[in-house]
Swiss-Prot record:
Alphabetical UniProt keywords: Cytoplasm, Lipid biosynthesis, Lipid metabolism, NAD, NADP, Nucleotide-binding, Oxidoreductase, Phospholipid biosynthesis, Phospholipid metabolism
Gene that encodes it: gpsA
Family: Belongs to the NAD-dependent glycerol-3-phosphate dehydrogenase family.
GO CC term (a single one): cytosol
The protein's name in its UniProt record: Glycerol-3-phosphate dehydrogenase [NAD(P)+]
Record flagged with keyword Protease: no
Function: Catalyzes the reduction of the glycolytic intermediate dihydroxyacetone phosphate (DHAP) to sn-glycerol 3-phosphate (G3P), the key precursor for phospholipid synthesis.
UniProt binding sites for sn-glycerol 3-phosphate: 113, 142, 144, 198, 251, 261-263
Main location class: cytoplasm
Source species, domain of life: Bacteria
EC class (word): oxidoreductase
Length: 338
């Protein structure tokens, strides 16, 4: 373990996958002491040997001030601020494990995008259940690909929290990376919802391209997908303006148009005729949109929100519908006002 652990720790990042690693690298790039925690001790030991995450971010060396650990108690106790970057289906479990080690002044931000499996709850509700209502919470969301962030390419994102001081501190800490710009946003609900819905629409955009449709179809899916995001957001109490920003339109365009997106690549495979299981195997990493689709469609039904694109994607993923048939049914819908 790096001796910098004896110095002040700016932040602890919980989750040593591609995105968690890239965020830790970005935070530590200009000298800030950052802990990157992972649950797999062997994986963390290999990262320490390589001083890089060769599996997910090959060729990107870790800054000296990046500290690796598989010791959850040490990682949580070392820093006031925790940044959780784990898949949505284990988000609550990780926070439950974190709770016994929290400091009196601990604050938790997450960059996880999605909803709680089975319940469809926003992650804020999951976090409160796991650690209590007294711990300050924040969400970081927006258009970010791990490889570009780790390479130091310019990136912009947004952060939201009911705690204004926490937002200001997060902006200050993340801005230290010089190429990572962070906007503040007061819409805590919309900031959480956007990342889940865009995953679903990105699968649809990939399916469209996999079938062989062109840019016209992809753009129509993005535009009408944004409308679905706004309608569901309104039903849950979010602000429409949020979905015109980083956590909505920004993230949606990014993941629908670039093959760095796992959700888009998953959709491409489905559009090319592969089964759901084979498409997931081909990706080789968590495809958040697969689970998100089920939860987003359940929310749409619960709140009576019309989301035809999400419905068709749900039918492809969970009811065995062919991607071409889904596209045909979308195009055959009754004419309506935009």
């Amino acid at each position: 373990m790096n001796q910098n652990v004896n110095n002040a720790i700016t932040m602890t990042v919980l989750g040593a996958g591609s995105y968690g690693t890239s965020l830790a690298i970005s935070l530590a790039r200009y000298g800030a002491n950052v802990i990157l925690w992972g649950h797999d001790a062997e994986h963390i030991a290999q990262l320490e040997i390589d001083r890089a995450n060769e599996a997910f971010l090959p060729g990107v060396a870790f800054p000296e001030s990046l500290i690796l650990s598989a010791d959850l108690e040490m990682a949580v106790q070392a820093s006031r601020d925790l940044l959780v970057v784990v898949p949505s289906h284990v988000f609550g479990l990780v926070l439950s494990d974190v709770k016994p080690f929290l400091r009196e002044d601990s604050r938790i931000c997450w960059a996880t995008k999605g909803l709680e499996p089975e319940t469809g709850r926003l992650l804020k509700e999951v976090a409160v259940d796991a650690v209590g209502a007294e711990v300050p919470l924040a969400v970081l969301s927006g258009p970010t690909f791990a490889k570009e962030l780790a390479a130091g390419m310019p990136t912009a994102i947004a952060v939201s929290s009911p705690d204004d001081a926490f937002v200001e501190d997060l902006q200050e800490k993340i801005h230290c990376s010089k190429t990572f710009r962070v906007y503040s946003n007061s819409d805590f609900i919309g900031m959480q919802l956007g990342g889940a819905v865009k995953n679903v629409i990105a699968i649809g955009a990939g399916m469209s391209d996999g079938i062989g449709f062109g840019a016209n179809a992809r753009t129509a899916l993005i535009t009408r997908g944004l409308a679905e995001m706004c309608r569901l957001g309104a039903a849950l109490g979010a602000q429409k303006e949020t979905f015109m920003g980083m956590a909505g339109l920004g993230d949606l365009v990014l993941t629908c148009t670039d093959n760095q997106s796992r959700n888009r690549r998953f959709g491409l495979a489905l559009g090319q005729g592969k089964s759901v299981d084979q498409a997931q195997i081909d990706i080789g990493q968590v495809v958040e949109g697969y689970r998100n689709t089920k939860e987003v469609w359940a929310l749409a039904q619960r709140y009576g929100v019309e989301m035809p694109i999400s419905e068709q994607i749900y039918q492809v993923l969970y009811q065995g519908k062919d991607a071409r048939e889904a596209a045909k049914d979308l195009l055959a819908r009754d004419k309506k006002y935009e």
